[in-house]
Amino acid sequence: KACRNKRWNVTIFDKDPKALIRTRNFIYPNRYKKWDKKIRLISKDENLFYDLIIIGTPPDSHLNIANTILDKNLCKVLHIEKPLCTPDLKGIGNFLRKVEKSRIKVICGYNHIFTKNTFLAKKLISKNNKIGKILTITAYNREHWGGIFAAHPWLKGPHESYLGHYRKGGGSLCEHSHAINLFVHFSHFLNLGKVKVVNADIQFEKKK
């Protein structure tokens, strides 16, 4: 919708024709009141060159798709939804080497660092000498996946999506990794250096 608001030509590709039908008849009209007839829907990759390609598939498929786009030089800008890949970082080294050699501008969907409140916080920190030395940074991402499943009622729960599987890039850590991104962003902004040690407490609950 954001792309159409800018009056860009938009093509949605999904190898599953049923997903495209669901997008046209249910998802888009429910969110934006009616379907936009100027949006193209395709189920076969046409290998055309685009100004912008957005990868919005499950995280465990991101790098494979992105590598193909980089190899074929299919766009000017490649936007990959977060998280960039799965927690095991499998294939990330090869991907980053391709990015360095490519003319394609590659970005990831951590957009919270560009919000008005983030800019305001940085402005206040820069101008207010009363804050003093920064001792700790705490980042919260108070979000619940209930909204996601409300928008995808054909899913019976997390188990039917990557969201319920952390190895596939789901789970609370990956799905809500905006908080990690904000933490690192402010750490760099305050010249506090890179993360050296990571410690986490996780409680797993198995439900029958």
Q: PLM features: what roles do these ranges have?
A:
Residues 1-33:
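N-terminal Rossmann-like dinucleotide-binding module
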Residues 55-60:
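N-terminal glycine-rich "phosphate-gripper" loop used for MgATP/nucleotide binding
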Residues 52, 63-113, 129:
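Beta-strand-loop-alpha-helix segment that lines the small-molecule cofactor/substrate pocket
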